[in-house]
A protein has these predicted regions:
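Peripheral, non-catalytic segments of secretory and membrane proteins
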Residues: 1-110
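UDENN/dDENN subdomains and adjacent acidic, S/T/P-rich linkers in DENN-containing trafficking regulators
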Residues: 97-444
C-alpha cells in the first residue's frame, strides 16, 4: 500500500552530498529486490538521488495519501498528468541529459468504509413555507460523497468538521444557498449485519470471530438554507451548534438557539446595517447588510479564484465561460468549489449563465458531465479515482493550479479576446495577485 503522506510538505528528492537528512523523513534507498533505488538520470559521477517521504500520523483519519507516482520528461513534450503534482527538482542532477521530474497523486487514504445515499433525519421548521419548500435533493448536497459508516482503530482522534457550501437553482433561476458541516458520531455496532461487519473489518474473514481494537462511526451533516449567501455567518453558527451538541449539559436546549436564530434575529437594513447576535458569552455572529454593487448578490469569492488559479488561468476561464464550454472545476477541498464556481458565472456580468450550473455536485449526480450542453460543475477530486471523465470537458484542478483540455479539441487561448482590453485586464489581475501574495506573506 502507498504510504499515507500529508499534503504539506510534499515528498522530496534527496541528493547525496547536497541535502542533509530531514527529521521525520524516510529514505527509499533500495527496491523491494534489494537493488539500488537511485533515481538520478545523470551519467557516471553524478550525485545519486533518492525519494524521501514522511508518513502521516498512524492514527490519522481522512488523511491524504500518495496513491500513484510517475516520471515526466518535459523535453519530450510530456507534461504533468491530470490530478498529479510535480516535485520541482529534476532527477537529472548532472550537467548532461534532459530534465526528468517525479509526479505524485494525492487521494483520500480511507478504508473500512460503507457508503450510502444520504437521507433526511430531521428538519426545522418541520413544515414547508409556501414561498420556500425544502428541495428533496438537499441531503445529497450536504453529504456529496455519501453518508458513510466507518471503522477506525480504537483511540483514533475525531477529524475536525468539514465545511462546504452549495447552490440550488430553481426552474425560475432563483438561487438557494446552502452551508453545511460534516462530522462523525459513534455508531452502535449491534445495528450492523454480519456482511457489514465483515466489510468494516470487525469480523475475521476465516472464522467470523470478532476483531477487537476498532470502533464504528457514521458521517452526518447539519445545514442552513437561505436565499442569502451569508456563508461566513452560517459557518460560525453551524460550528457553534455542533460544539454545543457535543458538550454540556447546558441550561438552554439546543432547539432554543436554533429557534432564536431563525425567528428572532432581524435582517440587516439601512437603519440597522449591522446585527450582532450573541450566541454565548464566547460566541457571537455579525450579520452585515450586503454591500451595494452593480454585481448581483452571490457567494462568489474573486479572491479565492485568483489565489487558486492565478491571473493567466483566470483569463482563460473567463474565455471558457463566455464561449459556453463544458467546465469542470474540482478540488480535494469542498469549501472552495462554490466560491470559485460563483465567481466564474459572476464575472461575465452583465451577461448571465443560462446553462446547467452545479458548483458542488454530489458524486451520485455526476452523470451531468455527459450532458450535450455547456455546464459549470464542481466535483470532489475523488471522482477521478472512480470514473473516466468525458473527453469534451475542460478540467480545472484548483489544488495544482492547472487546466487540462482534450488534445482532440482546439485549446482555448486568451488571444481570442480583444487584444487591448485583454492586456489591461491581465495587468490588473497580476497586480491584484501580487497584492494578495504580499498580504498573505505579511499575515504569515
Amino acid at each position: 500500500a502507498p504510504p499515507a503522506v500529508p499534503a504539506h510538505p510534499p515528498r522530496r528528492v534527496h541528493c547525496e552530498g547536497r541535502d542533509a537528512p530531514r527529521a521525520g523523513f524516510r529514505l527509499v534507498d533500495t527496491t523491494p529486490y534489494s537493488r539500488c533505488a537511485n533515481l538520478s538520470a545523470g551519467g557516471p559521477g553524478a550525485p545519486r538521488c533518492f525519494l524521501s517521504y514522511r508518513r502521516a500520523a498512524e492514527r490519522g483519519h481522512d488523511a491524504l495519501g500518495v496513491t500513484d507516482i510517475c516520471l515526466v520528461m518535459p523535453g519530450k513534450g510530456e507534461s504533468t498528468p491530470h490530478t498529479f503534482s510535480r516535485v520541482e527538482r529534476s532527477l537529472n542532477s548532472g550537467t548532461w541529459g534532459p530534465a526528468l521530474f517525479l509526479c505524485y497523486k494525492l487521494s483520500m487514504a480511507k478504508g473500512n468504509t460503507l457508503v450510502y445515499e444520504a437521507g433526511l433525519l430531521c428538519r426545522y421548521p418541520e413544515e414547508d413555507s409556501a414561498s420556500f419548500p425544502l428541495p428533496d435533493s438537499v441531503p445529497v448536497f450536504c453529504l456529496p460523497m455519501g453518508a458513510t459508516i466507518e471503522s477506525w482503530p480504537s483511540g483514533t482522534k475525531y477529524p475536525l468538521p468539514v465545511f462546504s457550501t452549495f447552490v440550488l437553482t430553481g426552474a425560475s433561476g432563483d438561487k438557494v444557498y446552502g452551508a453545511a458541516i460534516q462530522f462523525h458520531e459513534p455508531f452502535p455496532p449491534e445495528r450492523l449485519s454480519e456482511k457489514q461487519r465483515l466489510r468494516l473489518g470487525l469480523l475475521s474473514v476465516v472464522d467470523r470471530r470478532p476483531v477487537g481494537g476498532r470502533s464504528v462511526h457514521s458521517r452526518k451533516s447539519i445545514c442552513v438554507l437561505s436565499h442569502w449567501p451569508f456563508f461566513d455567518v452560517f459557518r460560525k453558527f453551524l460550528m457553534f451548534i455542533y460544539r454545543y451538541s457535543v458538550s454540556g449539559p447546558h441550561v438552554l436546549p439546543l432547539e432554543a438557539h436554533i429557534a432564536h436564530f431563525m425567528h428572532n434575529v432581524p435582517f440587516p437594513s439601512p437603519q440597522r446595517p449591522r446585527i450582532l447576535v450573541q450566541m454565548s458569552p464566547y460566541d457571537s455572529l455579525l450579520l452585515c447588510q450586503p454591500v451595494s454593487s452593480p454585481l448581483p448578490l452571490s457567494g462568489a469569492s474573486f479572491v479565492t479564484l485568483l489565489q487558486t488559479v492565478g491571473a493567466e488561468h483566470a483569463l482563460t476561464l473567463l474565455l471558457a465561460v463566455l464561449t459556453e464550454q463544458k467546465l469542470l472545476i474540482h478540488s480535494l477541498r469542498p469549501d472552495v468549489l462554490t466560491s470559485v464556481g460563483e465567481a466564474l458565472v459572476s464575472m461575465i456580468f452583465p451577461l448571465r449563465w443560462q446553462c446547467p450550473y452545479i458548483p458542488l455536485c454530489p458524486l451520485a449526480l455526476c452523470d451531468v458531465l455527459s450532458a450535450p450542453v455547456p455546464f459549470v460543475v464542481g466535483l470532489h477530486s475523488s471522482y477521478f479515482d472512480l470514473h473516466e471523465p468525458p473527453r469534451d470537458v475542460i478540467f480545472v484542478d484548483l489544488d495544482t493550479n492547472s487546466i487540462f483540455q482534450s488534445e482532440e479539441r482546439k485549446l482555448l487561448s486568451p488571444r481570442a479576446l480583444p487584444r487591448r482590453p485583454c492586456k489591461v485586464l491581465l495587468s490588473s489581475l497580476h497586480s491584484l495577485s501580487q497584492q494578495l501574495h504580499e498580504s498573505e506573506r505579511g499575515w504569515g
